[in-house]
Amino acid sequence: MEAGGGSLCVFKDVRLHIDKGQFVAMVGHSGCGKSTLLNIIAGLEQPSEGAIILDGKEIDTPGLDRMVVFQNFSLLPWMSVYENIHLAVKAAFAQWDRKRLHDYVQRYIHMVGLAGSEHKKPAALSGGMRQRVGLARAFAVQPKVLLLDEPFAQIDALTRVNIQDELMHMWTATQNTVFMVTHDVEEAILLSDRIALMTSGPEAELAEIVDVGFPRPRIREQVMDLPEYSRIKKYIMQFLKNNSREVSAGGAVPGAGVLVSKPVGAEA
């Protein structure tokens, strides 16, 4: 897959296969095309070459089978918490009756800890609360793929930790397929099953994939105390350092006990 505008190629030859129910994170420097790739998967942009295949079918337009959570709290400002979630759920499950829709929406409001705030408009919510609404709305639609575009980038550190924990809980309960792009290495290790490492752009490439073998459900403190956690973090940080714009040589220094693989396949 290649994406570019005019003479600029953002990334090239990205082949990534994601199994159903996997949580995959993509890490790389700014400008490597992470968000562009996510937008292509979402159907919001088109690649100059290649294709996205979902369940054996090529996709090139937005759809309810892919829900995106952006970092900019993309809620409808004139609607309440309940209404923002209800609108998406009703579109996805038009055949449900009113009571079933209501109970289902309330379930996800409770799941993200917003019970009692369902009638508030986005302007009355903190950044963390707004992003909780976005996550609840995305999970509630039951998409085939949930796309997270640095969803916690604009949230303070303490709130970010709490919402990451809620995201782990929701993923455990739903087993959604998730593709997330992030600059936060610790976040990627904690949340994901595999971490795709991108070289620096322009003409960025998918260099390798790090397998994160921690069992689920995960408890933050226990995971961060594991020797393997430190090894994976060191490996990825070294990769990013070696692939900074100031360094011409690519590729991370192999780390003992870190399982990596070259990208294969071409499906999402």
Model-predicted segments: where are they?
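The feature captures the beta-strand-to-loop junction immediately N-terminal to the Walker
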Residues: 27-29
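Helix-to-loop junction immediately C-terminal to a conserved catalytic motif
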Residues: 42
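Conserved ABC transporter NBD signature motif
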Residues: 50-61
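Short coil-to-helix segment of the ABC ATPase nucleotide-binding domain corresponding to the Q-loop/switch region
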Residues: 79-88
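Conserved ABC ATPase "signature" region
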Residues: 97-117, 169
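Conserved signature/switch motifs of ABC ATPase nucleotide-binding domains
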Residues: 120-123, 141
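Catalytic Walker B motif of ABC-type/P-loop ATPase nucleotide-binding domains
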Residues: 146-149
